[in-house]
Amino acid sequence: VPDGRLLPADLLARAYRKAAEDAARTNSLSYRDPRGSPDLRRAIADMLRRQRGLMVSPDHICITRGSQMGVFLTARILIRPGDAVLVERLTYEPAVAAFRACGAKIVTVGLDEDGVDVADVERACRKHRVRAIFVTPHHQFPTTVSMRPDRRLRLLEMARQFGLAVIEDDYDHEFHFGA
């Protein structure tokens, strides 16, 4: 047992008391928006509009504690038992686990040096009742290849044509490293 004299108990008690009083005074102990801080969601929506040209509002943003929670929540909303979810041949396995937990049938599609094989995606969409595709097009995980722009556009066309959701894990878009 550590020597109790080493612990600044009075100092800690004062700090805890002040934090609790401040929280009570500012109503910080009440329930918050489950989607996350409104200020943070507003800042992210602004960044996505400015840097990526996406037309989003803070209401389109939900802050999670990590990509796995985000994928799981998305899967719970979109996937019904028996729906097919397309995943790249090599992919983020925890996402596959989230889709399976929702009763999805996992269908693997090809991947090459230019990203997901869109011809393979189209074949799968014609063969299965596909609800979604999970992709990491910027730096594909785990290969790090980037999907060519023409393939990205074709994937969006197929999403409209077949009514499937594109679930993109853009885990490191803002990271850029020198050669």
Residue ranges and their predicted role:
Residues 1-18:
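N-terminal basic, amphipathic alpha-helical segments
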Residues 16, 21-163, 173-178:
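Conserved core of the PLP fold type I
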